[in-house]
Amino acid sequence: MRISTANTFDNTVSTLMSRQLQLQKSQTQLTSGKRISQASDDPTGAAQAERSRAEISRIDADNRALQASQNAMTLSESGLGDATDILQQIRETLVQAGDGSYTDTERKALATKIQDLRSQLFTIANRTDGAGNYLFSGQGSGGPPFVDQNGGAKYVGVAGTNQTGVFNGYPLSIDGRLAFEQANSGNGSFVTDAGTNVNTGDAPQAWVDTGSLIDPKALTGHGYTIQINGTAPAQNYVVTDDSSGNVVASDAYSSGHAIQFDGMSMSISGSPVDGDQFTVQPSTADLHVFDVLDRAVAHLTTPARSGAQVSQANATDLRDIDAVMRNMQNVRSQVGETMNNLDNTQTRMSALKLNAQTEKSNAEDLDMVQGISDFQSQQTGYQAALQTYAMVQRMSLLQFITS
C-alpha cells in the first residue's frame, strides 16, 4: 500500500493536536483541582456534583435557621432563670411576712418590695431577642405578649410557638401562657383554702395547710367541705363530699393533726370555733404568676387582720409561689431539652453536610496524585511525538541515497 507524504503529515499533525488538547485539559484540571469543569466532561459525575451542591445549600439554609432557634432558646432559658430567681426573692419576702410579730406597716413595706420585684418579672415576660422579637409571645410577635390592666396582667400573645427551618421546625419563641399562666394550683393535686363560718359568715379562726397526696388511686376529683363542730376542747371535724353530700370522714379535732380522706392528707391549726369551714377542690392548670403576686400584695396591705387570717393568707401565698416556681422550672427544663435536641440536630446536620461534600468531591474533584502522573505521562508522550515528527520531517529520498 502506498501512503503519500501529505497523508502522513496530516495524520501526524492530528495526533499532535490531540495530544496537545489532552495536555491542556490535564493542565486545566491540575490548576483548578477539578476533574469536571463542564458537564460534557462527565455528564453523570456533573449531575451527582450538582445534586450534592443543592443538598449542601439546603443544609446551610437549615443550619442558619437552627442557629437562630438556638439563640432564641438560649435567651428564653436565661429569661426563665431570671424569672425563677425573682420568684425566689419574693418567696423569701413572704416568709418574712409570715412573722406574727410584724406590724401592718412592716408588712406594707414588704408589699412594696414585692411590687418592685413584680415589675422586674413583668419586664422579663416581655423580653425580646434584641431584634424586636418577643421571646414569650408564642406565635405572635407584633407587640408585647403581656399587658398590665386594671384587673391585673393579661397574656395577649398567640398560643403556640413561631418556628423556622427547611427540614424541621425549630422554635423561635416560647408560649408565654405555659410559663406564666398555667401552673397547677394548690399542691398540684388539690387546693385547700379557708371558707367561712357557717353560723356567722366570718373568716375561720384557724388555717389549713397545703396538704399532700398520699394515694393517687384514691383521688375522686370531687370538691369537699371540712366543718368544725362544737367548742374546745370537745370539737370534731366532718368532711363532706360536695358532689354526693355524703360524709367521707369525721373524727375528733386536734390542732395540727392530719385529716385524711380519699387519698389526701392535710391539717388544720389554730383555735377554730363552731361552724368554721374549710374547702378542698381539685387542682387546675390555670394559676397565673402575676395574679399570685397581686393577691400577695393585697393580703399584705390589708390592715387589722387576725392571726389566723395572716397565717392562712401567708400559707396560701407561699403555696402558690411554690406552684408557679415549679411550673417555671418545668418549662425551663423543657427549653433545656429543646436546646439539647437542637445541639444533636446540629451534629447530625454537620455529618450530612460532610457526607454531601464528600460525594461532591468524589464526583468532581481531581485525584491530584493521579492527575500529576497523567500529566507527566502525557507531557512525555507529547514531547516524544514532537521529536519523532521533527526527525521524520528532516528525512528525504535524496538523503537516504546519498547516505
Feature names for model-found ranges:
Residues 144-306:
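Cysteine-poor, low-complexity segments in flexible/peripheral regions
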